């Protein structure tokens, strides 16, 4: 296994409910040359998830649509929810790695457009639900899940006002690619139970720090200490940020920050 599986249980379900296993992945950044990563993705079916959630950046190459669909093939037979990230819309372009340590000035150097409409169509054909500025009520093992999402906040495509409102069902979850504070605060105001995000790569390059490691950046306004894993502030929603599986073709490395997927098991309270 060339990645880390982050596993955690959360007591969010009503008493007497069956456990729900959620596979959360993000930032695959797939290209035709990512053979090891593709093999890891195909192995996830053995985790036997009840629900699959992707928080975007599936693609990193104009010929990656078929690659991604092949890698995800068996998972697409399961219930799935997804949103997109900036690299699903545009081919990555070179950026000075040191620029990630500076304050974001809002400028985006975008590459050529990717065939995201084709990819989106194929995902929906297989039954996965697009939550880019959309909301859906799904039922998993008898539990009604109010799921809402936003398009990529890094490109300012998020329109949470279109999905806001009192939560319905047994639990409410949010899905977004880049965990900007405006999105997280809006979801907290709606009293969601759990939010899934990606984008940060866990910092991608981390420094050893008192028995662990520390991120230097999140590439958004999320505090560095929340760059990966499950965290919570006071009574706000639990936030699971995936450090992701891949990386930009122009920065093909991870330092003290392994690729990862998350298996979150929702259990009764």
Predicted feature locations:
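Short, conserved loop/helix-junction motifs that constitute active-site signature segments
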Residues: 47, 72-77, 165-168, 187-190
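Conserved beta-sheet core of the metallophosphoesterase superfamily
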Residues: 179-262
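Binuclear metal-dependent hydrolase catalytic cores centered on His/Asp/Glu-rich metal-binding motifs
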Residues: 95-128, 134-135, 140-185, 251-254
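Solvent-exposed loop/turn segments at secondary-structure junctions
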Residues: 58-61, 86-90, 138, 152-155, ...
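Active-site neighborhood of phospho(di)ester-bond hydrolases with catalytic His/Asp-centered motifs
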Residues: 24-26, 51-57, 80-86, 131-134, ...
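Core catalytic region of metal-dependent phosphoesterases/phosphodiesterases
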Residues: 36-138, 223
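N-terminal membrane-anchoring alpha-helices
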Residues: 1-16
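Active-site-proximal beta-strand elements of phosphoester/diester hydrolases
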Residues: 19-29, 144-153, 173-177, 237-244
């Amino acid at each position: 296994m060339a990645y880390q599986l982050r596993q955690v249980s959360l007591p969010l379900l009503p008493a007497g409910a069956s456990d729900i296993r959620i596979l959360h992945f993000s930032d695959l950044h797939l290209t035709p040359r990512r053979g090891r990563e593709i093999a890891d993705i195909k192995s996830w079916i053995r985790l036997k998830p009840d629900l699959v959630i992707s928080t975007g950046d599936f693609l990193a190459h104009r010929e990656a649509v078929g690659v991604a669909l092949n890698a995800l093939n068996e998972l697409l037979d399961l219930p799935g929810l997804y949103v997109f990230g900036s690299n699903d819309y545009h081919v990555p372009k070179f950026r000075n790695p040191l620029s990630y340590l500076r304050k974001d000035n809002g400028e985006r150097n975008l590459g050529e457009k990717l065939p995201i409409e084709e990819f989106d169509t194929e995902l929906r054909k297989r039954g996965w639900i697009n939550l880019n500025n959309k909301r859906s009520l799904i039922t998993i093992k008898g539990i009604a899940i109010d799921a809402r999402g936003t398009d990529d906040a890094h490109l300012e495509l998020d329109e949470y006002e279109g999905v806001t409102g009192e939560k319905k069902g047994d639990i409410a979850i949010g899905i977004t690619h880049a965990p900007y504070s405006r999105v997280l605060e809006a979801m907290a105001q709606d009293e969601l139970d759990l939010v899934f995000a990606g984008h940060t790569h866990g910092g991608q390059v981390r420094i050893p720090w008192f028995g662990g490691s520390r991120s230097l950046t999140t590439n958004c306004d999320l505090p560095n200490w929340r760059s990966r894993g499950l965290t919570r502030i006071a009574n706000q929603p639990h936030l699971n940020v995936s450090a992701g599986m891949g990386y930009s073709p122009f920065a093909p490395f991870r330092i003290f920050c392994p690729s990862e997927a998350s298996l979150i098991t929702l259990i009764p309270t």
